[in-house]
Amino acid sequence: PMEIAFATENIVNTLGEVLAKANLKQLRIAETEKYAHVTYFFNGGHETKSIGEDHVLVPSPAVSSYDQKPEMSAFEVTKKIVDAVSGDKYDFILVNFANPDMVGHTGNFKAIIKAIEAVDSCIDKIVNSVLLRDGLVLITADHGNAEQKYNMQTGQIDKEHTTNPVPFILIGKEYAGRNIGWPTIAGGDLSII
């Protein structure tokens, strides 16, 4: 048997659990490449769904490399989100667009631009749909990738994740025209926001 250096961390009171305890309905949606991120990982490494938590998996395209189809399944994911928003069934919808990361890993700059343009178009549709219902949209990321494709030190194409700052954008009618700049969040603690 293999010895393990660190015990498995039991993550409790995830956002999903907090929403479920508050009897709020949740939708988690992504295409194949990021499905585990909106389900298993978002649930603290647990497979079990909470009460009121629905999952939607949209198949990723069957291509050998995502630079061949940089839009991936973003438009299909977006249609399902817009339909869910207009259905007024959910209090919280979590989506992970795979394109910036997965196409970013190809290092194909032209394809990366197309991927970002596709996601930008999709976010516009989602934001408009949510704002029509006086909802809030939060846009963020867990790492960078698409924004830096050239390593200045090596002169090589960079296909890896970056540690660059990521956006934290809150969109809602009550926030129109406000910009809080670049605050530092100590240790990633969002409770102070």
Short names for language-model regions:
Residues 1-193:
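Feature captures the catalytic ectodomains and active-site-proximal regions of enzymes
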